[in-house]
Amino acid sequence: MSVPVYLAKLAVKNPSDHRLAKIKRLCDAVGLADKVKPLGTVGEDEVVAIKLHFGEAGNDTYLHPTFVRQVVDCVKATGARPFLTDTCTLYKSTRHNAVDHLETAYRHGFTPYVVDAPVIMADGVTSKCYEEVAVNLKHFASVKIAQAFLSANAMVVLSHFKGHAMGGFGGAIKNLAMGCAPQAGKIDQHGRNVVIYPKCIGCGQCVPLCPRN
């Protein structure tokens, strides 16, 4: 199924044609307001999850908070109440738990004062807040989804393109599939490690490399 793709060029030809204004026009072009509250199911005081990647410490290629603010404003214009969200990483990093993840997000500018919306970790403090959802698909009969996504009335997904050590690159699909899963769901997607006993010499070198100890 094909869908329209809208492109906003980075070049600014006049002061009123700045990038923030272009993001607002993109929101209008895709009909964000109608998509946030389809068939009237989402309205005043309902919550909308804005899923994005807050960036790892030391990186600067995440979406700029002032860009995200424009999307927040568009969602708020519908009467809904947005919040920014993501999940804990499986690997040990500055986003491995909600405390470190929030501090990283704040350092990168994703504060309520800038984005005008709260930041809530979707899978709880230690990635234990999730539900098993039946899907009955090829690879999984059920999948683990972070609780905040299931509690929201609607979701807006903001993705940025980036390199990935294992997959080559990551974008919108990974932002949803891996990004909406708690650590337990990420383990399921990566596949479980299996000890090849005839080759294992019990050296223990694999233990410190395991993100889940």
Locate predicted features.
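N-terminal and secondary-structure boundary signal
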Residues: M1-N213
